[in-house]
Amino acid sequence: GGVSSTNLTREEARHRSEIIKVERYHVRIDVRGADADGATHFTSNTRVRFSTKEPDTFLDLLDGEIESVIVNDEEIEPEYDGSRIQLHRLHTHRKNLVIVTAKLPYQHTGQGLHRFVDPADGKVYLYTHFEAADSRRVYSVFEQPDLKAHVDFDVIAPSGWRVASNQVHEDIREEENGLLHDFALTPRMSTYLTAIAAGPYVRFDDEWHSRDGSESIPLGILARASLAEYVDHEEIFKITKQGLTFYHRAFDYPYPWGKYDQIFVPEYNLGAMENPGLVTFTENYIHRGPATRSELAGRTNTILHEMAHMWFGDLVTPKWWDDLWLKESFAEYMGAHASVAGTEYREAWTNFAVGRKAWAYTADQQSTTHPIVADIVDLEAARQNFDGITYAKGASVLKQLVAHVGVEQFFGAARRYFRELAFSSATLDDLIRYLEKASGRDLSSWVDAWLKTTGPDVLLPELTIRDGVVSELAVVCDSVDARTGRNVNRPHTLRVGLYSLRGDDLVRADLVDLTISSPRAPVREAAGKPAPDLILINDDDLTYAKARLGATGTKTALSHLSGLAEPLARALVWSMLWNCVRDAKLKVQNYLDAAALHSPKETEPAILATVLQQLQMAVENYLPDSTREDARRAEAARAWRGLDVSEPGSDLQRIWARHALALSAADPDSVERTRGLLDGDVTGLVVDPEMRWQSWMALAALGRASAEDLDAELERDRTKTGVAHHMAALTARPDDVAKQEAYRRLRTPGELSNEHCLAYIDGLRTPLGVETFADLNSSYFDDLEQIWQEFPIEMAQRLVVGLFPDGDVAEIADRWLASHQSATGGLTRMVKERRDAASRAETARDFNN
């Protein structure tokens, strides 16, 4: 079919930005009934002032019941199709004022104005999330990033509530049955960045001062009342202040949004969102038990990522979604860079190398890979591109660009970019222009090779040894565009590390700087050196490529990986080994044995957690059925041993405990250990509510937890997460009736919130529940289009990915794709990605047979 009117195209947006300039929105949102049982709608009144060169255009508003539309003092009959309000006979020589009043629904999908009822105390909370195009679920708007405007929010809310928006309060006054909160006018900004939150949130306050005392920024942290006791506001404020100090120095442009509030919200779809002055975060960043250092480092990274957006993304905004990567790669890069430069979390690039980069390599090797600069023709395509390429590959390539032009030049360019483009929109060409000025280099061929192609390069060491000495070392670079098959010769600025065994230590004997601009780059400095035991091609992780270890290096790594003193080097080698497992170039058993040997000696929490997760993935997906069950038992036993030898009370102990519980769900021999952990038998281990539920989940999956056991646990923890874990655990039991009911509810539109949808999927997808799930889900491929049509996109995505069948289904998926070529891009993209994962797993299972 044609493009639905809810789906704005790039051409329509381009046309609108040529003819329209928006002056300001005055938005009044009335949520006075929100705290009543079963409240479904709120009232929205928008007054938008704008000029236009043409008499006809449209405003965006989704799913509204329109009460009135007034155009320049004249009430008109609304011409509205559920997503666009058509406007005619507008003034082309003076300003227009359009006033729209409408009723709109509260959402339960985490987009628009989300309404949540806290099971702990019955309190109601509201918050908004608009990226990419959901401000139109709350007010009438020209919904595109380059039509910036000043926004003036008023919110009428129940009297006991706290209300926040992008700016500070100007006034609060009595209204019938409530209070009117009048917020200050915002600077010029994109509408997807506007935000409000309302409810009985608890608030913490602090203030940041610049070093010379000339500037101060009021800081706030908000969270639900039932979570407030767990909010470690001192740590969060500390990181926030360190970040503001760092960015003021690095960007040399004062924070432009007045105050800085950070709010933790329930049932949130993402990690966080950079609404200026009111940054939203998932509540997963608030820990109800001890947080490991890698969790704190991860949260720090996110806080600093969002803060970077205050300049890059909010102050200067990508003109359209094809430059989404501009802001995301930059923020992702800055999250790690600022962690290292401004906080105690100096290990950020190690965590990036072992975690985020794996996401990039996975995404970039799927059939759906796309260039970093993607071709985004409409909003539907934009939604699909919040992915591992836009974020993680983008940041890796930006890190390579910094290595290529120099860090001072990079920040110099950023400063000019903010200064000269403040409060406007920009494209890739703008950023590159500033980078070329700052570095004095022509970057056009670099941009073409890196940003307009797909797939990672493969880098291999080619080593000739004579009499124990290197006669020649070269790096062979296989640089192919995954989509076209053409050679693209991506240039690399990198370092090659030569490592030698001294006892059990793997010591870096030499580090060589190398630029690669051809298929084979000789490493001249290596000639005449003693033969290395391991060659780390991308040492210090400056570039983005799949580097291989070669036969000698792989052997050394498998036996001596923990002998590497530098955490970043260990992270890189683990990542290289994992890439080989995924590519069916290294046997799973070799990887498992290496993990058994080295993970008990691993001291970096992020590396340990990632390796243990990947090990479980390898057992479940890449081993043939014939050996999987034995491997599950063996790995669960190793996990409990790892827990036993870890230091009581340490982060590493928590990671081993989580790993042991994750593996126990598939190992009947682990029942006693799991019960013991639940009863507090593990010395030094704090068993918080999350870990209790993880234990119950394992017992439930093994058929060793009754509904009564799980109900009793819910009584202990009647909270948002408690309710979701309870649903998952009830479904995980080998009880066909419970599983059928969960499946039925999943497939009923409007039945579940986003979080409960995931809980049921988790409960159905336990390793031992595979057969029952396959029976329930046998019509998956027949039902795909129906799912896509019946559910809002956030839910449809969860179902398409979450219910994709296990096993050898690549061929069935191929048949579906071949016979559904007219299905929407969003749906086919997800099926292709699951199909690719299934096919990769089939190849690996054959290889490991």
What are these model-predicted stretches?
Residues 1-43, 68, 119-125, 145, ...:
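N-terminal, polar/Ser/Thr-rich
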Residues 10-19, 101-152, 199-207, 541-567, ...:
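Glycine/proline-rich low-complexity spacer/linker segments in large multi-domain proteins
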Residues 44, 130-133, 141-304, 333, ...:
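Hydrophobic helix-coil surface modules that form long, contiguous segments used
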Residues 47-63, 143, 151-158, 429, ...:
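Surface-exposed beta-strand/loop patches in extracellular or lumenal glycoproteins
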Residues 57, 62-119, 140-143, 182, ...:
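A surface-exposed beta-strand-loop module
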Residues 65-72, 443-444, 454-538:
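Beta-strand-rich binding/interaction modules
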Residues 183, 214, 221-478, 482-485, ...:
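Hydrophobic alpha-helical and helix-loop surface patches within well-folded domains
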Residues 358, 388, 470-472, 485-487, ...:
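Long, ordered, helix-rich scaffold segments
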